[in-house]
Each structure stands twice: as C-alpha cells, then as structure tokens.
C-alpha cells in the first residue's frame, strides 16, 4: 500500500493542524478540554479555547469563527487532525464542506 503524500505548506493559512487536549480540573475526575488550532507554516496559534466538554458541535463553531476571523476563502486551507470523534463527526465535516475547508486525517494504525 502506498503512503499518502506529505502535506507541505509553502505559506501561512494553507494548512492548519488541530487537536483537543485533556486538562485535569480541580476535582478528581473532572477535566477541561483545550481546543488548539495552529498554522503549520508559521506555527501561529490561530485559535485556542477551553471548554468543559468535547464535542463536534463546538469544533465546528470554532472552525467557523477562525475562517471568518482569518478571512479564509473556499478551497484555501487544509485542516489536519487525528481520527477523533469531534474531528470526524457529521456536524464538523458538514461545516468544513460549507466553508470550503479540506479535511485531512492521520492514517489509522492497524
């Protein structure tokens, strides 16, 4: 099986990478979730927010905000992530399609 070609950004706002990081809360078993989006060319953090839950709806809202804030045009950007639920959920994918953002996912390890 052939490996996919690596993603290479030649300038800012071409490829963003994002993930959700679990952060311990003040109470045992309580977590907060850091949503962080970074431009892979410039390493600029284009947005970060902390929430009390992890969801594809929140992910979609953040991407919509970022694209408006950064004035991203349809077909301009690739958004790379792992294969987590909030990254591949129907709401998130529909938002990406509406915005003209191309999703990219890490290859699953079998």
Name what the model sees in each region.
Residues 1-110:
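Charged DNA-binding/catalytic regions of mobile-element recombinases
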